[in-house]
Amino acid sequence: MPEISGVSWYGFAIVCGLVVADFVLGVARAFVQGGYRSSELCRGLARKGAFIAVMLLAAYLEWGATVWPPISALATLPLFDAVAVGVAMIELSSIVENIVAINPDLADAPFWSHFSSKAIKNK
């Protein structure tokens, strides 16, 4: 991997793993609920691709800040880390939501109940 100051490629790999896990669980959820549609699959893949693109853009900006003086002020900001943490939080909440949808018995458990469809609709 290329060395870019401030960019953790381990973080990128972890977030990509979360994206794949969310995708697999989302497909499983669709099959379990009988609502599998290729249009939803394409929309979900586009969303995942956009997350990856935003992370790569943040890494590119961090690299650009080290070689192009007009944007050197960006070099002090942890852009990639902030974006990666944000995407990871979105993916983790989606993974938990998919798990609860696949196994509705979890919806009554104290922690998992926050991620059930009923809890989301009541907010």
Residue ranges and their predicted role:
Residues M1-W9:
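Short, strongly hydrophobic alpha-helical membrane anchors
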Residues S8-F12, A46-A50, L77-V87, E97:
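Alpha-helical transmembrane segments of integral membrane proteins
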Residues V15-L25, F51-A59, V83-S94:
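Alpha-helical transmembrane segments of multi-pass membrane proteins
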Residues A28-V32, L56-P69:
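Membrane-helix exit/interface motif
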Residues A73, V87-K123:
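Membrane-proximal cytosolic segments adjacent to transmembrane helices
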